[in-house]
């Protein structure tokens, strides 16, 4: 894990400044960037930021999701895991207890009792970090940030995200208490750097990782997680469906500085050899507890896929495209019974409240093609999600709502408007949406368009789409492309919404561009490495980093250089400009106020 891999230029190119351990750091003013920390009200509350030092002596502070991996003063080791940042905060509240937990079974990793344990691949399989017992609320208490917020308490986690978001801690508490924002922070994931999801805050981006029966290993998934967070992923979902699901998840959680989400239904299905009709509430419940004990911060639950809604998909062009949705539809039809997730939802609420696991209520009937957008099945499920959201709130469980999908541009706004109305403004978490179906290999672009639009109108978190969508499992480069694409969409929405400080980043880069400060442009970019690479393809020499032109227009046709020349030759102070205008007015009057003057002989 080197700094060269970070969401920042390599240190050898920028003269990277090391971060000091003090709050609100200004350590190391060399040009480039360094990891810094803004101090809170207590010694153990230090909020990470990326500070970019510019060649003009100014600096820009940016939101940072990369965790300790980009702090050269921290010795990270994936076999040891990250330091438990929140552990003392959790213990100090006095409302949780450690307990033995459920035993880890072979089937948790998709292995039969008769199978050898040797199916685990890479990283020596079982996580070797410090032994830990799971923690849960005492005596059935809800130990959720929602419960605290409703009691008027401002937790250290709330203060942490307030500093990150450049808002007051009271705003954070109010939004969580109202159900308009969630903070996924399982008590068993103390390594997390708290973040918040809600329409009053910065638009967040989720990256998906996960193995499958066809490809990938534990080591690859851990590396994908750290890679995604370095490029700006605010949360990561582990959607593993192959072997080693439990073990992969343990490695990911112990090394993740961001919230980790899952779809418990996938692992439950593995436990019954992929036969949906053999699923039971007991198997699903056990899987949820297993994942909650490990520290999963939010879970997608497809409780809105009900038996009466399945026939509504019969005339669709692409039917049910959600994996979780199709599993639950198959179960409902096999038993001709109501969904066990819907019928046992209140018991599920009690479980999640004991660990502070956030609901991500799944859109199992989302449209999988433009033709199916905004149909009866989609909105029937949405109405049920609104009902379930209100039940979850009774149990003090934080809740967000998942959304589509494939939606043409003219139908996007209806989705966010209905969701906000039906679900009492609970945070909306959408997959894109994809605005056209004609671009396999470019669906990060088709969906990025929809993502920017729906985030502008109020979606709180965007689930990224990579170039491999509909084609295969994304690799490392695909993950980076997906994250960068969606960070662009999210930031564009932050600008449109007028989020505090959002435009400062753009203004800093615009100034650097106009003043031909190439290194500053690279260092301020979402993807500094690619920006530098593209520039150097045509102007690789070091003096080109100070040239007042690039290879697109050359020195004679650069519009910004011409603009600078005009300012230099004809510009001046505002007073000088106004005096010049007044003089021209007098000359016009002296000429008889004539618009057209006679031609000279």
Curated annotation (Swiss-Prot):
Keywords: 4Fe-4S, Iron, Iron-sulfur, Lyase, Metal-binding, S-adenosyl-L-methionine, Thiamine biosynthesis, Zinc
Enzyme class: lyase
UniProt cofactor note: Binds 1 [4Fe-4S] cluster per subunit. The cluster is coordinated with 3 cysteines and an exchangeable S-adenosyl-L-methionine.
Signal peptide: none
Binding residue positions for substrate: 208, 237, 266, 302, 322-324, 363-366, 402, 429
Basic and acidic residues bias spans: 100-112
Family affiliation: Belongs to the ThiC family.
Name this protein carries in UniProt: Phosphomethylpyrimidine synthase
Species the sequence originates in: Streptomyces avermitilis (strain ATCC 31267 / DSM 46492 / JCM 5070 / NBRC 14893 / NCIMB 12804 / NRRL 8165 / MA-4680)
């Amino acid at each position: 894990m080197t700094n060269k891999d970070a969401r920042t230029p390599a240190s050898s190119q920028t003269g990277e400044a090391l971060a000091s351990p003090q709050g609100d750091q200004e350590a190391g003013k060399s040009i480039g960037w360094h990891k810094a920390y803004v101090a809170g009200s207590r010694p153990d509350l230090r909020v990470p930021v990326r500070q970019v030092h510019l060649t003009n002596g100014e600096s820009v502070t940016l939101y940072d999701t990369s965790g300790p991996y980009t702090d050269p003063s921290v010795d990270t080791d994936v076999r040891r895991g990250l330091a438990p940042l929140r552990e003392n905060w959790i213990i100090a509240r006095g409302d949780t207890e450690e307990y033995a937990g459920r035993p880890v079974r072979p089937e948790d990793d998709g292995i039969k009792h008769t199978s050898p344990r040797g199916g685990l691949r890479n990283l020596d399989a079982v996580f070797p970090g410090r032994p830990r017992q799971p923690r849960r609320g005492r005596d059935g208490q809800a130990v959720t940030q929602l419960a605290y917020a409703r009691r008027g308490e401002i937790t250290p986690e709330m203060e942490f995200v307030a500093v990150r978001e450049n808002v007051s801690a009271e705003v954070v508490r109010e939004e969580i208490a109202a159900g308009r924002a969630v903070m996924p922070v399982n008590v068993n994931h103390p390594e997390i750097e708290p973040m918040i999801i809600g329409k009053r805050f910065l638009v967040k981006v989720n990256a998906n990782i996960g193995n499958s029966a066809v490809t990938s290993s534990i080591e690859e998934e851990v590396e994908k997680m750290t890679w995604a967070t370095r490029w700006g992923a605010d949360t990561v979902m582990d959607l593993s469906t192959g072997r080693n699901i439990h073990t992969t998840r343990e490695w990911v959680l112990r090394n993740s500085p961001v919230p980790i989400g899952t779809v418990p239904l996938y692992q439950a299905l593995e436990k019954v050899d992929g036969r949906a009709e053999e699923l039971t509430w007991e198997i699903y419940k056990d899987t949820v507890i297993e994942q909650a004990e490990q520290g999963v911060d939010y879970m997608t639950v497809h409780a809105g896929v009900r038996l009466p809604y399945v026939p509504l998909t019969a005339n669709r062009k692409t039917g049910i495209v959600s994996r979780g949705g199709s599993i639950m539809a198959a179960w409902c039809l096999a038993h001709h019974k109501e969904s066990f997730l819907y019928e046992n939802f209140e018991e599920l609420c009690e479980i999640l409240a004991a660990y502070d696991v956030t609901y991500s209520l799944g859109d199992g009937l989302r449209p999988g093609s433009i033709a199916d957008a905004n149909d009866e099945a989609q909105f029937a499920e949405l109405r049920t999600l609104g009902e379930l959201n209100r039940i979850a709130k009774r149990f003090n469980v934080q809740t967000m709502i998942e959304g589509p999908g494939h939606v043409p541009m003219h139908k996007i706004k209806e989705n966010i408007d209905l969701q906000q109305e039906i679900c009492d403004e609970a945070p909306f978490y959408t997959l894109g949406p994809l605005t056209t179906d004609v671009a396999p290999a470019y669906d990060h672009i088709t969906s990025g368009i929809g993502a920017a639009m729906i985030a502008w109108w109020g979606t709180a978190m965007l689930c990224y789409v990579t170039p491999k969508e509909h084609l295969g499992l994304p690799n490392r480069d695909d993950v980076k492309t997906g994250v960068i694409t969606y960070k662009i969409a999210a930031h564009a929405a932050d600008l449109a919404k007028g989020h505090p400080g959002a435009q400062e980043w753009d203004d800093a880069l615009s100034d650097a561009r106009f003043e031909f400060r190439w290194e500053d442009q690279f260092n301020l970019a979402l993807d500094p490495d690619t920006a530098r690479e593209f520039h150097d393809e045509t102007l690789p020499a070091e003096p080109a980093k100070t040239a007042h032109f690039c290879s697109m227009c050359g020195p004679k046709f650069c519009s910004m250089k011409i603009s600078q020349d005009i300012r230099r030759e004809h510009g001046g102070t505002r007073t000088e400009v106004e005096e010049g205008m007044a003089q021209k007015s007098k000359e016009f009057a002296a000429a008889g106020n004539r618009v057209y003057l006679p031609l000279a002989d």
